[in-house]
From Swiss-Prot:
Family annotation (PROSITE patterns): RIBOSOMAL_S14
PANTHER family referenced in this protein's UniProt entry, alphabetically: 30S RIBOSOMAL PROTEIN S14 (PTHR19836), SMALL RIBOSOMAL SUBUNIT PROTEIN US14M (PTHR19836:SF19)
The record's free-text note on cofactor binding: Binds 1 zinc ion per subunit.
Keyword annotations of the record: Metal-binding, Ribonucleoprotein, Ribosomal protein, RNA-binding, rRNA-binding, Zinc
Binding site for Zn(2+): C24, C27, C40, C43
Its job: Binds 16S rRNA, required for the assembly of 30S particles and may also be responsible for determining the conformation of the 16S rRNA at the A site.
Protein known as: Small ribosomal subunit protein uS14
Chain segments annotated as transmembrane: none
Organism: Campylobacter concisus (strain 13826)
Subunit structure: Part of the 30S ribosomal subunit. Contacts proteins S3 and S10.
Length: 61
């Protein structure tokens, strides 16, 4: 879980545009965030397995 101070810091507009980065909207994780959903891979997998994201299911072949 991310610290509240880091989540607040990421929410502010950065002084320089290249310093901005995405965070997971659910847990605050800074890495491996999918832009389409706005959540990290860990939360995406958990929500997909529970069936909370329509049209997304586990692949099998």
């Amino acid at each position: 879980m991310a610290k509240k101070s880091m989540i607040a810091k990421a929410a502010r507009k950065p002084k320089f545009a290249v310093r901005g980065y995405t965070r997971c909207q659910i847990c605050g994780r800074p890495h491996s965030v999918y832009k389409d959903f706005g959540i990290c891979r860990v939360c995406l997998r958990k929500m997909a397995n529970e069936g909370l994201i329509p049209g997304l299911k586990k692949a099998s072949w």
